[in-house]
Amino acid sequence: MTRLENMYKKEVVPALIKRFGYSNPMAVPRLVKITLNMGVGEAATNKKVLENALADMAKISGQKPIVTKSRISVASFKIRNGWPIGCKTTLRRSKMYEFLDRLINISLPCVRDFRGIPPRSFDGRGNFNMGVKEQVVFPEIDFDAVDAIRGMDIAITTTANSDAEAKALLDAFNFPFRN
């Protein structure tokens, strides 16, 4: 069991029950999954770029990502239907908690001029989305071996019914929100 899983069971659940008045510990919001997505537009013309993005994503997430393909043809982007244009992976259970721990305690403090995450990134249904502009903030990525700086999207899916509950859950995990 990871450090954040222990923290969730021993500290977060009782604190949220006290704050929101849940009658059952199973009603307390919990993390369901974390989805990482990396769009690589240059992959339509250069296959090596996609291979490097897949390798970076595999190092960051600890599991093999899948290639995402375009759903429609767009002439202005010079892509056709079915061409590979990115990669994504979904983390659940212990890998999810390990990634979240590394994100909160190691990666986000390494971001230049980091002042906190804006709390307006909730979607209204208790899920949280954020972007990272550089993949080199993760300790698994060797800065000298990187061919290009790529960003990624991170979507944290919870069972919370509202943004307030989801924010309280992520606050309990010491998520660095901006004031």
UniProtKB/Swiss-Prot annotation:
Gene3D superfamilies: 3.30.1440.10. GO terms for biological process: translation. One of its GO terms (cellular component) is ribosome. The keyword Signal does not apply. It comes from the Bacteria. The keyword RNA-binding applies. Coiled coil: none annotated. It holds the Pfam family Ribosomal_L5. Belongs to the universal ribosomal protein uL5 family. This is one of the proteins that bind and probably mediate the attachment of the 5S RNA into the large ribosomal subunit, where it forms part of the central protuberance. In the 70S ribosome it contacts protein S13 of the 30S subunit (bridge B1b), connecting the 2 subunits; this bridge is implicated in subunit movement. Contacts the P site tRNA; the 5S rRNA and some of its associated proteins might help stabilize positioning of ribosome-bound tRNAs. This is Large ribosomal subunit protein uL5.
